[in-house]
Amino acid sequence: MNAQREPSGLERLEQALDYRFTQSDLLQLALTHRSAPLDGSKAGEVVATTHNERLEFLGDSVLNLIVSHRLYKRFGEVPEGQLSQWRAMLVNTRSLSEVAKDLELGRYLRMGRGEAKSGGREKYSILGNALEALLGAIYLDGGFEAAERVVDRLFAHQVAGIEPEQQGKDYKTLLQEYLQARGEALPIYAVLSAEGPPHERVFVVSCHPREQLCGHGQGRSKREAEQHAAQQALELLIESENEHHD
């Protein structure tokens, strides 16, 4: 009786994805960081001229479209701004890296010795980018429906966890999470004015998440004004990011 063959490393990854590549070179390319040496070269001498960044570009668009469609179908009465915020939370670098870690994606990546020694297999940005590249590779290999199935499998828990009555209300927290996921500093809030008698005072607050970007908010309390300022700042950031992707 023949012993059952143990799956190879990449076969284990395919099992975790529940998708088997017909073009194995696409899978290899998706897992190749730009620091990886060319085959046969010494580490650090010649870096790969083919790496996963173009696939990452493609996978980013594929992922955004699929997640956008899922949110659009599930939340029929939710306005565009709120859908954009939920999508940003689902596909930000930290969220992607967590999905990548569940797949143990770091262990399969090809990268240079220096990058690996500096913790490259655990870096949020590298893991998130590799996951997007993987989705781009699946799209090229099996088409959009195959990519949809994999995204649904990987992100089902996150999408199911969104509850309209609980999410999207604390804009200060949403803004903080958005910035932290991108490795940016926390926003700076400042009270611009506080006018009127104590029982009818109106506060105007500014929120600076980045040097050249500012949100403004008004409210009957400082906290309410900060929430409105954070909401506007977050919407401006998402709008800027969407324009960048376009």
Swiss-Prot record:
Residues 10-143 form the RNase III domain. Mg(2+) binds at E56, N129, E132. The active site is at D60, E132. CDD domains: DSRM_RNAse_III_family, RIBOc. One of its GO terms (molecular function) is metal ion binding. It catalyses: Endonucleolytic cleavage to 5'-phosphomonoester. It holds the Pfam family Ribonucleas_3_3. Residues 170-239 form the DRBM domain. One of its GO terms (biological process) is rRNA processing. InterPro entries: dsRBD_dom (IPR014720), RNase_III (IPR011907), RNase_III_dom (IPR000999), RNase_III_sf (IPR036389). The keyword RNA-binding applies. PROSITE patterns: DS_RBD, RNASE_3_1, RNASE_3_2. Its EC number is 3.1.26.3. It comes from the Bacteria. Gene3D superfamilies: 3.30.160.20, Ribonuclease III domain. NCBIfam families: RNaseIII (TIGR02191). Homodimer. Digests double-stranded RNA. Involved in the processing of primary rRNA transcript to yield the immediate precursors to the large and small rRNAs (23S and 16S). Processes some mRNAs, and tRNAs when they are encoded in the rRNA operon. Processes pre-crRNA and tracrRNA of type II CRISPR loci if present in the organism. HAMAP family: RNase_III. This is Ribonuclease 3. It comes from Magnetococcus marinus (strain ATCC BAA-1437 / JCM 17883 / MC-1). The gene is rnc.
